[in-house]
């Protein structure tokens, strides 16, 4: 009795549909899908600069250390 069977979940689903209606549930589903899509797009833009940082660190290793000379005499 610790877990719910499929019949318990179906009864809960019917009650939720009666309380909220199918139109509101559809709107909630669309909003949730849009939020997930926005999160995935945000993660893609976050990962792109990381690749650019790796490329710039590879070029930074090719720099040469020099000493500056005093040009003011």
From Swiss-Prot:
Its main location: membrane. Residues 62-73 have a biased composition (Basic and acidic residues). Gene3D superfamilies: 1.20.5.3310. Disulfide bonds: none annotated. Residues 50-73 are annotated as: Disordered. GO terms for cellular component: TAT protein transport complex. Pfam families: TatA_B_E (PF02416). It comes from the Bacteria. PANTHER family: SEC-INDEPENDENT PROTEIN TRANSLOCASE PROTEIN TATA. HAMAP family: TatA_E (MF_00236). This is Sec-independent protein translocase protein TatA. It comes from Polynucleobacter necessarius subsp. necessarius (strain STIR1). The lineage of its organism: Bacteria, Pseudomonadati, Pseudomonadota, Betaproteobacteria, Burkholderiales.
């Amino acid at each position: 009795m610790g877990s719910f069977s499929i019949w318990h979940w179906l009864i809960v689903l019917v009650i939720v549909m009666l309380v909220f209606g199918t139109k509101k549930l559809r709107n909630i589903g669309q909003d949730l899908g849009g939020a997930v899509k926005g999160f995935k797009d945000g993660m893609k833009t976050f990962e792109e600069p990381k690749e650019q940082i790796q490329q710039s660190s590879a070029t930074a290793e090719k720099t040469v250390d020099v000493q500056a000379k005093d040009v003011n005499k």
